[in-house]
């Protein structure tokens, strides 16, 4: 993203008549992510939320449909927020690298999701397109699962959990037939370790990829969410 905005700044400053054209397969998610990033970089908007709302409003043709046509995937919106931080706090530079050790994952409001206790889940952790860790809860493979029935939650404690740095993708599969969405999994998300504070990341339902969609809300209740807990190596 930083290379992209630097390239666009150079191009746009070369001639006032210059324009940029950004596209992807659908012209919504990935395109919107980069458009919103440029809107922040060029001082047209100060924050990620305003730029995302503006892009969605301009891209939605209300004469044809009221369906929102902006950036919808939460992880894409999250990275627009990361860019806002890089611009305002780090002078358009990457923040200092922050390696973290993943200790455990807590699934909130898990009743009715799969077997309702986390035992059907498989967790995959991917860095730079490489699978760096996998645990199978049913077999207690590389993890132990602790149902917290009183709090409607389940804790997956990773055994020899990975040390990760930079962009991290976390995918959840289910052996209990949970409906699949994008990436052919029930739910997943991306984050970057440099933006983790207090060794904890909490993502509510509307910040998880796939459960953010209203059509899934009969399964994923309003207080569904995922917490990840880290330690410093």
Kindly label every feature range from the protein language model.
Residues 1-21, 26-233:
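PTP/DSP superfamily signal
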């Amino acid at each position: 993203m930083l290379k992209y905005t630097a390239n666009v700044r150079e191009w746009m400053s070369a001639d006032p008549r210059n324009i940029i054209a950004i596209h992807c397969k659908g012209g919504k998610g990935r395109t919107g992510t980069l458009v919103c990033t440029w809107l922040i970089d060029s001082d047209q908007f100060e924050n990620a939320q305003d730029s995302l709302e503006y892009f969605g409003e301009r891209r939605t043709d209300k004469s044809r449909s009221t369906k929102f046509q902006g950036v919808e995937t939460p992880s894409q919106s999250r990275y627009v927020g990361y860019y806002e931080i890089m611009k305002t706090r780090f002078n358009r530079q990457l923040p200092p690298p922050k390696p973290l050790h993943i200790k455990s994952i807590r699934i909130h409001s898990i009743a009715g999701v799969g077997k309702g206790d986390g035992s059907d889940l498989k967790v995959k952790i991917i860095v730079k397109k490489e699978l760096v860790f996998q645990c199978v809860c049913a077999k207690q493979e590389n993890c132990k699962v602790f149902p917290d029935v009183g709090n409607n939650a389940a804790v997956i404690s990773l055994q020899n959990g990975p040390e990760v740095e930079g962009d991290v993708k976390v995918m959840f599969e289910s052996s209990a037939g949970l409906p699949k969405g994008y990436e052919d999994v029930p739910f997943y998300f991306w984050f970057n370790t440099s933006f983790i504070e207090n060794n904890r990341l909490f993502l509510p339902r509307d910040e998880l990829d796939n459960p953010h969609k209203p059509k899934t809300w009969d399964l994923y209740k309003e207080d569904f969410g995922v917490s990840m807990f880290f330690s410093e190596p």
